[in-house]
Amino acid sequence: MSKLFESRLADVIRKPVITEKATNALDLNQYTFEVDHRAAKPQIKAAIEALFNVKVIGINTMNPPRRTRRVGKFSGKRSQVKKAIVRLAEGDKIQLFPES
């Protein structure tokens, strides 16, 4: 892959989601990431495989509605968030936490 293509793939993945449900899914070899809301499943798969050198078996995505926030009398919307649950091949792992 070219460096330009890899740098664009790095922008697809924003951060890992660390919740109790996502941590329990690690036992099933499923990792949850917050991704760009415009990213499609093939782009997410290519980004995960290129950045972490793993084989992706399946991807589930969810695009929940934006939440409304108020500050005083002003009302606004929070930024759009898309989550991707990525299932990896048997034997592949992503190092999310440093080992101690």
Curated annotation (Swiss-Prot):
InterPro entries: Nucleotide-bd_a/b_plait_sf, Ribosomal_uL23-like, Ribosomal_uL23/eL15/eS24_sf, Ribosomal_uL23_CS. GO terms for cellular component: ribonucleoprotein complex; ribosome. Pfam families: Ribosomal_L23 (PF00276). GO terms for molecular function: rRNA binding; structural constituent of ribosome. Belongs to the universal ribosomal protein uL23 family. This is Large ribosomal subunit protein uL23. The keyword Cytoplasm does not apply. Disulfide bonds: none annotated. One of its GO terms (biological process) is translation. One of the early assembly proteins it binds 23S rRNA. One of the proteins that surrounds the polypeptide exit tunnel on the outside of the ribosome. Forms the main docking site for trigger factor binding to the ribosome. The keyword Zinc does not apply. Keywords: Ribonucleoprotein, Ribosomal protein, RNA-binding, rRNA-binding. Part of the 50S ribosomal subunit. Contacts protein L29, and trigger factor when it is bound to the ribosome. Coiled coil: none annotated.
